[in-house]
Curated annotation (Swiss-Prot):
GO terms for biological process: base-excision repair, AP site formation via deaminated base removal. It is found in: Cytoplasm. It comes from Psychromonas ingrahamii (strain DSM 17664 / CCUG 51855 / 37). This is Uracil-DNA glycosylase. GO terms for cellular component: cytoplasm.
Length: 216
């Protein structure tokens, strides 16, 4: 199944209609919702189901103007790199030989190499993190994870922090690889994320399979 077919399937479900009604009501109230509507499904558009090598699961989008473009942990060109992404870059610099920390926080080049940068909740209101939780997006993205689990094999899931760890129950660990650590947030990065070597492990696994390595 393609992501287009998957999304069409979800659109016919009751939970999705309720979710869209909620989003419509918020827009009618004049709320600023991020990311912009055309980027809500950016992760799915940039990383087709059949191309997925890695899934990096986030929680919900950045909630400040201009930050969110539909990819977990990523920000568009010209936007200040957020603290969690700074720690991701820090970990990359210690685990990937020759890695130079970029000036941009745009991870679209990861997405185009088969890394699905998926938030569990796909929209947020300006300056109100988590406000679109439990409105239906979790069902949508859980169903997407289940689709990956069923349709593919050998996908590497990077689950950072307790929220992401719970999604591990949707993944068949006999078919896929699950790597876990604490969240890269400054609050928890030093309790296990920094030093986790997930990025080098991903390339080691891909090398063993004689697959194209990720250019981080």
């Amino acid at each position: 199944m393609s992501w287009k077919k998957f999304i069409t399937q979800q659109e016919s479900m009751e939970y999705y209609n309720a979710l869209q009604a909620f989003l419509k009501s918020q827009k009618e109230l004049g709320k600023n919702i991020y990311p912009p509507e055309h980027l809500v499904f950016n992760a799915f558009n940039l990383t087709p189901l059949e191309n997925i090598k890695v899934v990096i699961l986030g929680q919900d989008p950045y909630h400040r103007e201009g930050q969110s473009h539909g990819l977990s942990f990523s920000v568009p060109e010209g936007i200040k790199i957020p603290p969690s992404l700074r720690n991701i870059y820090k970990e990359l610099s210690t685990s990937i030989e020759g890695y130079k920390i970029p000036e941009s926080g745009n991870l679209a080049h990861w997405a185009k190499q088969g890394i699905l940068l998926l938030n569990s909740v796909l929209t947020v209101e300006q300056a109100d993190p988590g406000c679109h939780a439990k409105k239906g997006w979790e069902t949508f993205t859980d169903n997407a994870i289940s689709e990956i689990n069923n349709a593919r094999s050998g996908v590497i899931f990077l689950l950072w922090g307790s929220y992401a760890h719970k999604k591990g129950s949707l993944i068949d660990k006999n078919k896929h690889t699950v790597l876990t650590s604490t969240h890269p947030s400054p609050l928890s990065a030093y309790r296990g994320f920094l030093g986790c070597k997930h990025f080098s492990q991903v390339n080691d696994i891909l090398a063993e399979r004689r697959e194209q390595l990720i250019i981080w």
